[in-house]
């Protein structure tokens, strides 16, 4: 009996231990994988993990990484609001200048630009890959700590003489490369559509068919979509050109310098007169540099504005050619329709004349005795008289229609 109790207690202790062993793992939450670990997941897993998307981060030192990040991570790195970040995920082109970042959406290129780095959405898109290659070319990798420090100070420290005068700020150069890639994309599409347009228009002038008309309609739809893209980006650039203050908001490096100067002034132990004199000298020197950079930015925007304006005019010219061809095709169709109507009227007039002759023949075919039946050789004269009557009726009707200008 005692051995039975001991074995039962041993089994209960083993069972309790097993229950504890089974419960311990359930109390531990699974570790959250890093952003880079989610890159290879499926679309459903990305949605379950809070909208993780593939982003490419490229900084001013030439360092580049590709990782899957959610919106909260991008907001934390770029200091933009969630409302502004939604602009990058929309299908409409938009350029937003904020305190610490620029949200750029050119449809094919979607990026968040800061004074230190640029984050590109849709890393596997061909246009984004082209932009990444251009960035690698313009910002070669600097692996050494001295080079990294020099590159950072070169863009952010004022220096009065060799600071910002030596080259454009990082964000300006990224904008320039992005506009260059976008203009190249639009230009290639315009060339392709122009080639298709001329071939389709030549075919239409030779032969009007349903297949050619379908191709023309598809081409016109593509031109309309491309024109809307170009027009939207052009309007965004024009907005910054018209508003100097908004253009100055694109200068993120200047804001960073001003913040650094403010912090240095608040933490300085220099006497107040010397500090004011030193600050005024730095401000006067930086104002000249900033004005030069703003002028450079204005010239940059004007250059791409004119380039987009030229592409827009080329697209509008192609649409005018298409509209002219459509008008020509409509004229041909109307001419053919008028010819068919003319032929139908002539046939109807002929039917009217023949019907009149048939009435005469039917009258003679009735079983009513008349004197003509006994007249010899009268049949031929009657037949030719009926034919002459039909011809006369046809000529008279056609002449009346032409007199009333119903027929040409």
From Swiss-Prot:
Transmembrane segments: 345-365, 378-398
Residue ranges, annotated region (Disordered): 1-44
InterPro entries: MRS2-like (IPR039204)
Nucleotide-binding as UniProt keyword: no
Transit peptide as recorded in UniProt: 1-96
Membrane topology value: Multi-pass membrane protein
GO terms for MF: magnesium ion transmembrane transporter activity
CC terms in the record's Gene Ontology section: mitochondrial membrane; mitochondrion; plasma membrane
Keyword Acyltransferase belongs to the record: no
Keywords from the named record: Ion transport, Magnesium, Membrane, Mitochondrion, Transit peptide, Transmembrane, Transmembrane helix, Transport
GO BP term, pick one: pollen development
Chief location category: mitochondrion
Tissue: Expressed predominantly in flowers notably in anthers at early stages of flower development.
Compositionally biased residues, Polar residues: 1-10
Chain positions of motif Required for magnesium transport activity: 365-367
UniProt subcellular location: Mitochondrion membrane
Family that this chain belongs to: Belongs to the CorA metal ion transporter (MIT) (TC 1.A.35.5) family.
Miscellaneous comment as given in the Swiss-Prot or TrEMBL entry: Has the ability to complement mutants in Salmonella typhimurium and yeast lacking magnesium transport capability.
Record's function text: Magnesium transporter that mediates the influx/efflux of magnesium in a concentration-dependent manner. Plays a crucial role in male gametophyte development and male fertility.
Name of this chain's protein: Magnesium transporter MRS2-6, mitochondrial
